[in-house]
Swiss-Prot record:
This is Uncharacterized protein C16C4.19. InterPro entries: Rpr2/Snm1/Rpp21 (IPR007175). Residues 170-184 have a biased composition (Polar residues). It comes from Schizosaccharomyces pombe (strain 972 / ATCC 24843). It holds the Pfam family Rpr2. GO terms for cellular component: cytosol; nucleolar ribonuclease P complex; nucleus; ribonuclease MRP complex. Residues 154-184 are annotated as: Disordered. GO terms for biological process: endonucleolytic cleavage in ITS1 to separate SSU-rRNA from 5.8S rRNA and LSU-rRNA from tricistronic rRNA transcript (SSU-rRNA, 5.8S rRNA, LSU-rRNA); tRNA processing.
Length: 184
């Protein structure tokens, strides 16, 4: 077997045997991590989420692993401008609850959340007082329609609809007993 297939096999067999024998599963994971070191291969961050590289326990989220994201503090970085606060890198901290081993994986810099200044200016120009009034009117109309729907869906609305159906049925039926007896 080539190296990647062997590592993948060890990981899958560790996951399958955990329910039967956790110690055997731990042995397979420790063997996988020792082969990674022996072959001088880089450990994929996704691989570190499967099991602990120190004790070999298979991670079950909420039972024997604790994950959290850690971001750099603004106060610790004095060389940054105020606008670059959101560009600080974050790390994923993996804490094995079996052996208390902590491993950090860099997640990189998060994407910018704010819009560009040109887009903000264009948005401000597009919004004028007339559009605000129109939006208020449409919001008011939506509330009125919602109230009407709630009234119609209530008990009184159901009874009113049933009365209307009965009236329509009476007016359109030509074979009622009153209609038949009235000419006599």
């Amino acid at each position: 077997m080539d190296q990647e297939r062997k590592l993948q096999f060890l990981l899958s067999i560790a996951a399958e045997t955990y329910a039967i024998s956790p110690s055997l599963s731990s042995h397979y994971l420790r063997r996988m991590f020792s082969l990674l070191e022996e072959w001088n291969l880089e450990t994929d961050p996704k691989t570190l989420l499967h099991g602990c590289s120190k004790c070999g326990s298979l991670f079950i989220f909420g039972r024997n692993i604790k994950l959290r994201t850690i971001s750099s503090e603004r106060k610790a970085r004095t060389d940054l401008k105020k606008g670059e606060v959101s560009r600080l890198g974050t790390n994923l901290e993996i804490n094995c609850l079996v052996c208390s081993y902590v491993h950090e994986i860099p997640l990189g810099v998060p994407l910018r959340l704010h819009q560009s200044k040109q887009a903000l200016r264009a948005k401000a120009i597009a919004e004028s007082s007339s559009t605000k009034l129109e939006s208020r009117k449409s919001a008011h109309n939506a509330k009125v329609k919602q109230r009407q729907r709630l009234r119609a869906s209530g008990l009184n609305g159901i009874l009113d609809r049933k009365k209307k159906k009965d009236e329509v049925a009476k007016s359109t039926s030509s074979l009622s007993l009153q209609d038949f007896m009235s000419p006599i």
